[in-house]
Swiss-Prot record:
Belongs to the uroporphyrinogen decarboxylase family. Its EC number is 4.1.1.37. CDD domains: URO-D (cd00717). The keyword Cell cycle does not apply. Keywords: Cytoplasm, Decarboxylase, Lyase, Porphyrin biosynthesis. One of its GO terms (biological process) is protoporphyrinogen IX biosynthetic process. It catalyses: uroporphyrinogen III + 4 H(+) = coproporphyrinogen III + 4 CO2. GO terms for cellular component: cytosol. Pathway: Porphyrin-containing compound metabolism; protoporphyrin-IX biosynthesis; coproporphyrinogen-III from 5-aminolevulinate: step 4/4. This is Uroporphyrinogen decarboxylase. It holds the Pfam family URO-D. One of its GO terms (molecular function) is uroporphyrinogen decarboxylase activity.
Length: 344
């Protein structure tokens, strides 16, 4: 890689002309890399994030290996929750587990606030360290209020989100207070990361697709409007992403953000037809990375042909990299996207 700074990703976020389609992958730092798996034999996720030099190494590894156009900070959306009074444990094969789920208005009232400089200095130190090392933009991220709330109410991952919806419908006052508290936490946490040097922010609303449009507008969209309006003042690109949320992309397009992330269920041309005018990011089905190269290349080409119709397009997956994916496949895919987009 050249030592000069590669700002292709930032240009694409703003819809500015650039010479190739930028590429990065959700969960590019981690599970599919042998070097990472070796580190995980010794340290947990949270232990890695608390060691800035080690965390920076893990974050930077896929950029060096795949020649990607952006790095995304290695951490978890659960990172800030312990500091507002939520006990979280990441269990192998199960994900985040919370032993004291939210069940009442009083539970919501008890939640505290985060002081990033005191509570998560290692996150900020890692960002500062990476800014010294990287020659591509650094993306950081946070969980959106709805998705964090779903974990806090369900006590962990869910397939139906019945407890979350029941709480939302039965306790609207408590729900909106919870959204307000999580919105403020997100704003404070993200602003500190931007101040430390993060050059773009992705908000993961991973599970909001469980809601219909009407409920999204009433129970979630107001806090997202406030959150993005505050973060927009920091003048870095803001990205929104959720899974199974194709019916909400037009709602996201209304928000004060820069990039709409798509999962693999909605084609880019369909998103444009639905009225998405902002930069689009996505959206190769991560399962396709387990197929023969000819299939991967053909699907990537289909996505590129749609994305290349405007300069505001970023190539990514429609969800995170699977552990079974070969690192060489990702390296080859990045090279293909760069070459094909530069010549078309």
């Amino acid at each position: 890689m050249s030592n000069s700074f590669n700002d292709t990703f930032l240009k694409a976020c703003k819809g500015e002309v650039h010479d190739h389609v930028p590429v990065w992958y959700m969960r590019q730092a981690g599970r599919s890399q042998p070097e990472y798996r070796k580190i995980k034999e010794k340290y947990s996720l949270f232990e890695i994030t608390k060691q800035p030099e080690l965390c920076a190494y893990v974050t930077k590894l896929p950029v060096d290996q795949y020649n990607n156009d952006a790095a995304i900070l290695y951490k978890d959306i659960m990172t800030p929750l312990p500091f507002i009074g939520v006990d979280v444990e990441i269990k192998t094969g199960k994900g985040p587990v919370i032993d004291n789920p939210i069940q009442s208005y009083a539970d919501v009232e008890r939640l505290g606030t985060i002081q990033p400089e005191e509570d998560v200095p290692y996150v900020l130190d890692t960002i500062k360290l990476l800014r010294e090392q990287l020659t591509v933009p650094l993306i950081s991220f946070a969980g959106a209020p709805f998705t964090l709330a779903s974990y806090m109410i369900e006590g962990g991952p869910s397939k139906s989100y019945n407890k979350t919806k029941a709480f939302m419908y039965a306790e609207p006052k408590a729900w909106h207070l919870l959204m307000d508290k999580l919105g403020e936490m997100t704003i404070t946490y993200v602003k500190a990361q931007i101040a430390a040097g993060a050059q773009a922010i992705q908000i993961f609303d991973s599970w909001v697709g469980t809601l219909n449009v009407q409920d999204y507008r009433v129970f979630v969209k107001p806090v997202m409007e406030r959150t993005f309006s505050e973060l927009q003042k920091e003048k870095v690109p803001l990205i929104m992403f959720g899974v199974g949320a194709s019916h909400l992309v037009n709602e996201w397009n209304d928000l004060p953000l820069d990039v709409v992330g798509l999962d693999w269920r909605l084609q880019i041309k369909e998103a444009r037809e639905l009225g998405v005018t902002k930069t689009v990011q996505g959206n190769l089905d991560p399962a396709i990375l387990l197929a023969p190269w000819e299939v991967i290349e053909a699907r990537a080409k289909e996505i590129l042909d749609q994305g290349l119709e405007t300069p505001n397009f970023i190539f990514n997956l429609g969800h995170g990299v699977f552990p079974e994916v070969e690192p060489d496949t990702l390296k080859r895919l990045t090279a293909f996207v760069h070459e094909y987009s530069a010549n078309n």
